[in-house]
Amino acid sequence: MATPCIQNAFRRKTLPVRIGDLFVGSEHSIKIQSMTTTATTDVDGTVRQICALQEWGCDIVRVTVQGLREVHACEHIKDRLIQQNISIPLVADIHFFPQAAIHVVDCVDKVRINPGNYVDKRNMFTGKIYSDEQYAHSLEHLMNKFSPLVEKCKRLGKAMRIGVNHGSLSERVTQRYGNTIEGMVYSALEYAEVCVAMDYHDVIFSMKSSNPKVMVAAYRSLAYELDQREWSYPLHLGVTEAGSGTAGIVKSAVGIGTLLSEGLGDTIRCSLTGSPINEIPICIDLLKQTTELSERWGEADNPFAIHSSKQLGTRNTLNTPPWGNVYGLLINLTDVQLLTAEPIELLQCLGIDTTTGKIDPTTPEGVVVPKAMRSSPIVSEIEKHLLVFNKEDVPILNPMNEEEWLSEETLSAPFVYFEVTDIHTARRFFSLRQHSTQPVCLSFSLDPHLSKNEAIIDLSARLGALLLDGLGSCVLLDFVDIKLSRTLGFLILQSANIRSVTVEYVSCPGCGRTLFDLLAVSQRIRERTQHLPGGLKIAVMGCIVNGPGEMADADFGYVGSKPGMIDLYVKHKCVKSCIPIENAEEELVQLLKEHGVWKEPE
């Protein structure tokens, strides 16, 4: 299955789906969704959190339903919300227990199921091979087990989300398609076919992954396959287990922002570790920033044009030492910054230890300075550690001047800067120059009036969308906050799977199944391991329901198995189980040592 990418976009046309008192779809505003972190059986606490989420701007709220106790709790939660005149739709999250879905649909507005575990067994990597006959029999079994829920949802007018998660595909699907984007898409389509056959259409789809590159490719592919079949169902967007803090916001904005800018997505969630309340302002800012980007689309001559990313041209790295084939980061320094900054402070902002000369992993490869400042003492000091480019020596291409893009003067330069004002103009630039091997440095300026979160989201959405398609050779960032610029630059490169300079953390946002304080444990593990080399991925997951699957590409996993107990994973394999939580962090360090990735902090 080809992985498509989208060059021009309006919002993808979808059917309207009713969820309680609101509608989701292309003719309606994009809705914000979150999930409670309270135990669903804690009715009072769950209702309080739902009310708080609505006050902050959440449109749809989901609760976990593990079994019949949670089904009964949902009845009380819904009654309490009605009594308080709170109309926010209530969604039940189902894994492994179809009977819970059948019962809870009576009292909720929507049911979310995971095709990877609703009927089939989750893949346990046993190596089982399915014959064509066995595969066909499994599909018949799926129809028999899934159709009662479809029939009841249709009869009661309730909605459903078919939510596929990368890494938690069924054994049957993984055996045939692998743990791949193709497997994710076909997992969703198998369930979609049952819904279509039963003339049930109040369906929303999601294709989540903790890896934004996988997530974006999966949504693009599913949208293409659905539209080829004229199944115009809405999409719920999210980067699952995005983590916490700035890194979590960047991951979410790279994935969700890219798709929103392409016209995909009807509901969104930023799955950040910690209180779900913290997700809502980020979602609001993300919708605001991507709406402003979409207003600059102009008239797209081929709306929702899906094509191979190869049509846009391939990325050529700027082959200047010390880069080689490394995707580089440059920071623009203005004459004001160079004239007014304290030299030591400026070097430290760039990641250079002025005492030892040591370079931080997130130090940019170089800086761009005004030619008139090249001989200044501060630039001479910077040049001892980093590459220095004169701003006037390299063409800066105007995004509005297409003639300039292909001029002889432009094409004869060793490389060029292209100022990225919007995603679609940049894609057109690369499409017109697809036969050129000239390296292009993507130049981004950030509005100094943006708040920190707005700046993070704006840059992540604009830059991430291009990096995910392999466009550009390096990045030039121009922002008054130099330290924030380099931090964001490398986080976005890491989120786009282009370059990894620090440890990456995958951590779930928490829900009613969570067995420990996710935020506190995640922060402690980060503090103990953040000095380790880039390229390492560590997952911290609240429970074993989704944990082992959703940390699909993590190297090491810390997963709650039962109250007070932790399982440790290497890749998909549980290697240490039922460790008392007070010992688990030390056991994780020991596991890192056993696998040769640990080093003592300096």
Curated annotation (Swiss-Prot):
UniProt keywords, alphabetically: 4Fe-4S, Iron, Iron-sulfur, Isoprene biosynthesis, Metal-binding, Oxidoreductase
Organism listed in the record: Chlamydia trachomatis serovar D (strain ATCC VR-885 / DSM 19411 / UW-3/Cx)
Pfam families in the record: GcpE
Family membership noted in the UniProt record: Belongs to the IspG family.
Gene: ispG
Entry protein name: 4-hydroxy-3-methylbut-2-en-1-yl diphosphate synthase (flavodoxin)
Metabolic or biological pathway, per its Swiss-Prot or TrEMBL entry: Isoprenoid biosynthesis; isopentenyl diphosphate biosynthesis via DXP pathway; isopentenyl diphosphate from 1-deoxy-D-xylulose 5-phosphate: step 5/6
Protein's GO biological process: isopentenyl diphosphate biosynthetic process, methylerythritol 4-phosphate pathway; terpenoid biosynthetic process
EC number: 1.17.7.3
